[in-house]
């Protein structure tokens, strides 16, 4: 992890010692553990963390160590983070905007097998890269309002 890490007992200690005049990333292993436990207890489905909301290696690594087995990724950069800090975790590529090269890397380099499309052209892009296989999951999104007006 390339982010410098300094441990403080709490936020007040950080403010007293550093007096930061810049945005600071604060990470509480204890709080993340608590929140993860609450989610796991209250939801027995597949929990998937959206890397886009906070792509910190510290968070991805701890979530994986706590048993999170899937991550929602929106770019090849996010896939690299998951590969490096949550090895073996499933990745769901739900970003509707992706080009052929990104799809190729997702499938061939990062092992992504779950894709989301919201336009027929995206299915063509996916089909050009991925050979028909039973190990691929494609979720289709559409706007009901537009579909119903047609």
Residue ranges, per PLM feature:
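Active-site loop/helix belt of alpha/beta enzymes
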Residues: 129-132, 144-150
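ATP-grasp fold ATP-binding core
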Residues: 137-143
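A charged N-terminal "starter" segment
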Residues: 1-136
